[in-house]
From Swiss-Prot:
Function: One of the primary rRNA binding proteins, it binds directly to 16S rRNA where it nucleates assembly of the head domain of the 30S subunit. Is located at the subunit interface close to the decoding center, probably blocks exit of the E-site tRNA.
Organism of origin: Campylobacter fetus subsp. fetus (strain 82-40)
Keywords, in A-Z order: Ribonucleoprotein, Ribosomal protein, RNA-binding, rRNA-binding, tRNA-binding
Family affiliation: Belongs to the universal ribosomal protein uS7 family.
Pfam families per record: Ribosomal_S7
Any GO BP: translation
Originating gene: rpsG
Keyword Ribosomal protein: yes
Name of this chain's protein: Small ribosomal subunit protein uS7
An example Gene Ontology molecular-function term: tRNA binding
Keyword Phosphoprotein tagged: no
Quaternary structure and interacting proteins, as annotated: Part of the 30S ribosomal subunit. Contacts proteins S9 and S11.
Length: 156
């Protein structure tokens, strides 16, 4: 184990929207250090949303999608006397954001549209409208926490 807690590295806001969450999203989207490809996919998806949405702005849809997918509660395994319990715990804000980004990207990759740009745009629109696979994942996570509320006293 490390002696001290690792310092949180500050990310630069993205050049177009000046938003740090978009930078984090691009970094999570990136494969093999190809940031320019990830950036192209992200901005392309936001432009696609701008074109589709009419009065909807891509950045607003993005922010709504992240907010809708952020989990409030999750379960963590805790071993007590030979039995493993799923203990519900609150999710810290930084982890909420990280999980929301991770879920949106992973479920966008599993979609059936042709390009990643289209997949991401569709998943962001679905998440902003409180539907889609990433939103369902959040709901399932919350249901698991609710179902295991009886073990909440095992929290540490």
């Amino acid at each position: 184990m490390r002696r001290r807690k690792a310092p949180v590295r500050e990310v630069m806001p993205d050049p177009i929207y000046g938003n740090k969450i978009i930078t984090k999203f691009i970094n999570s989207l990136m494969y093999d250090g190809k940031k320019s490809v990830a950036t192209e996919i992200m901005y392309g998806a936001l432009k696609t949303i701008d074109a589709k949405g009419g009065d909807l702005k891509g950045i607003n849809v993005f922010n709504d999608a992240i907010d809708n997918v952020k989990p409030i509660m999750e379960v963590k395994s805790r071993r007590v006397g030979g039995a493993t319990y799923q203990v519900p715990v609150e999710v810290r804000p930084a982890r909420q954001q990280a999980l929301a980004i991770r879920w949106i990207i992973s479920f966008a990759r599993k979609r059936s549209e042709r390009t990643m740009m289209e997949k991401l745009a569709a998943e962001l629109l679905d998440a902003a409208n409180s539907k889609g696979a990433s939103f369902k994942k959040k709901e399932d996570t919350y249901k698991m926490a609710e179902a295991n509320k009886a073990f909440a006293h095992y929290r540490w």
